[in-house]
Amino acid sequence: MPEFDPQNRSPHLLIVSHDVVDKMMAGPGMRYLEMARVLKDEIDVTLAVPAQTSLDITGLNIVVYQEAQPGTLQVLVENSDIVLVSGYMVEKFPFLETTSTRLVVDLYAPFILENLHYYLDEPMNYQQAVNSQAVAITNCLLKIGDFFMCGNSRQRDLWLGALTANGRVNPLTFADDSRLQKLIDVVGIGFPARQPRHEQAMMRDAHPLVPGDARIVLWGGGIWNWLDPLTLVQAWPQVVARHPEARLVFLGTRHPNPDVPYHEMVDKTIALAEQIGEKDKTIIFIEWLAYMERESLLLEADVGVMLHPIHIETRYSARTRVLDYLWARLPVLITEGDVTSEWVARYGLGRVVPEGNSDSVAAALNEILDQPKAAFAQAFEPLMQRFSWPVVVQPLLRYCREGEYAPDRLNRRSPDVTTSISSPLIRSWLARSVYIMRTEGMQALLQRAWRYFQWRVARL
């Protein structure tokens, strides 16, 4: 196993992003880019990305790995002291199960819960197959990690239960730290330790439907199936009746990562906007903006909106776009039920509304728009330091500097995932095969099977 001597050199951390990191990117890409940007000033960091990027950041080494060639990532992993991984990567790159490099597992996005809503319209046997796959992959991650990160304190309780079920809460980890923060800690979403910059006009006097005196209500991210943009559109006629200068802007109808499936909620939202007669009038749909351009749009907006149904995914979610709103001191309209809604209520950052109630949404929006945006500015001050990336990333930095394996890693048996068809991960691969064949075709399934075969042969 690679040994780290803190007296001789800085530990080398490899951050592996499973999502696009470029001028246009979604929450995961932003998360890993900002982590790497902050940590590069403290330790040796490489950011590995799945596609070519045009970004060039001074002092940050960015490399490209290819899913079709697992060796491109494996050589990076085996030559690092610590690697940060997440999600389905352990399935795509099985060598992660046996690497001696220390593993940090990012549990920020609980995809088991996301899938429950995402596949809701599929046949039940298909939903169960997808769920079994997600559970098996999650359990594998929980067994092999040395340190785990999650998005908030609610998530930490959820994941502590899962870690307990996987044998990771044990006398060894308890003796190491009775609070188990050396095993799992909160590394949520932050914002840069600087003020956002308005470098170009994005909507006011720059878009033909947005006059200079417009009050902009911003849906600042993807229109995902598990969110609730429809209630916002239903409420909109009551808003423009009182504030005819208001414009509702939806950002990001299509994910910047082409591998992410299209969400039906986009079509439903556009159709409802047409139905009420406001599409391309006071309701505007724009494409995903470049990462730096979003700052200008955030500063032009008057309200940031995040509406969702209340369900299990909501309770444990951590929405990137809400942190963007907070960074720009943008008053927030949000549905109750998640952690960020508690912040909005506690600090007076906007208004919290019940789920699915268009009258409440309209009343809250009108109340916010009745006041100048500056009326809310001071309420954001207590959060500026707390949620800056240099503060948020501290638990990960502490782990990297300590350079330790989990105390139970060397004393537990490596997970046996190859000897029996009854293995949970084997069963998940069977479910995954069905899923790939249905969504990507037989050729894609055969290509993935061939890559896995090559990896197994290389280990003989």
Question: Which residues fall in each region the model found?
Answer:
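N-terminal subdomain of nucleotide-sugar transferases
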Residues: M1-S54, Q238-A241, I436-L460
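Conserved donor-binding/catalytic core segment of Leloir-type glycosyltransferases
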Residues: L14-S17, F191-Q195, M202, A206-L227, ...
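Nucleotide-sugar-dependent
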Residues: L227, A290-S296, G304-L326, I334-E342
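Nucleotide-activated donor-binding/catalytic signature segment of Leloir-type glycosyltransferases, i.e.
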Residues: G252-R254, P261-E295
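Donor nucleotide-sugar binding/catalytic pocket of nucleotide-sugar-dependent glycosyltransferases
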Residues: C140-R204, G212
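C-terminal amphipathic helix plus adjacent low-complexity
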Residues: R179-L180, M384-L460
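Acceptor-binding helix/loop patch of EC 2.4 sugar-transfer enzymes
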Residues: H18, D22, V105-A136, D157-W159, ...
